[in-house]
Amino acid sequence: MEVYLDNSATTRAYECVRDIVGKVMCEDYGNPSSMHKKGVDAEAYVREAKETLAKILKVQEKELYFTSGGTESDYLALIGDARANHRAGKHLITSSIEHPAILNTMRYLEEEEGYRVTYLPVDEYGRIRLDALKEALCDETILVSVMYVNNEVGSVQPIAEASAIVKAYNKNILFHVDAVQGFGKYKIYPKKMGIDMLSVSGHKIHGPKGIGFIYINEKAKVKPIIFGGEQQKNMRSGTENVPGIAGIGLAAKTIYTDLDEKVAHMRALKQHFIEGVQKIDHTVIHGLYDETSAPHIISVGFAGIRSEVLLHTLEEKGIYVSSGSACASNHPAISGVLKGIGAGKEYLDATLRFSMSEFTTEEEIDYTLETLYNCVPMLRKYTRH
């Protein structure tokens, strides 16, 4: 049996997405900026995707810009805001457990462009401390960036509450949300929640890789980071990736169809898995695992077994999981997220992330649990202390 439990790293594309991407590449392959029929046909896919995404988020189509993915969207939000608003201040705020796309961009702004960054602490469950956010705000603050769902432990941030604090202090501070793990799992309404910029990636919602988008409130002052042919109102130049755009639009439409049922399915499997894995001695579930946590992510520490060893043992049995953020997994290191939530030292290099999708089955979860029951005691027996 093959069991894919690494859906926070990437997802299997919907069949309908594969079909439309292939159709656009092979039949409707025109440049959407061209004036002839092939170009007009291609532009129709871009327009349809924008209509779909705008309807899901309840925003205006003109506030959406397609990018190469979540990382570029995050970069545009942070760098674009910093360069547009540096005269108003050079202080930025984020959390200590953000995705590397945020943390490394923040460090760049600190080290290369002279910005001051405050990294908010989180509680034991991975939620930002709102009192720390209040204390961090100052007259120099121009941006606050907080992720919707943590990609390692599944903590869900109090986005609306955080935005309210920021806007009460200064309505001109831009509030950015990395929603790469939250979009497709939650109904997100930027206008209602006080979100000025929102980053999304296609391949986390059963869409193509290499495509994402960013919502930027029409009133937000943001400078482009890529220059060229002035596509997308000069905010993101470069010929649009029409196959990817068609794919992400259809993926979003599909995932938000019967979303509540899909989320309930994942939550039930998550609870089933947690109840089963807790039967194994010396294990810990990192973060919350109730209804306030993400429906698809489970972070489990197995004391006495290195993450990499257990990961490859499961791989031999056809089970695919992750030892943390896949975006950093080629460079093994102790997780900053686990450190941030105060995880015990015995779990820092002994934790795996199991992440599900709507396609995950109870049979797959049972097989994974049975495999863990067999291999965890065996590996501990042969681990040197």
Regions found by a protein language model. Give the residues of each.
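Pyridoxal 5′-phosphate
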Residues: 1-385
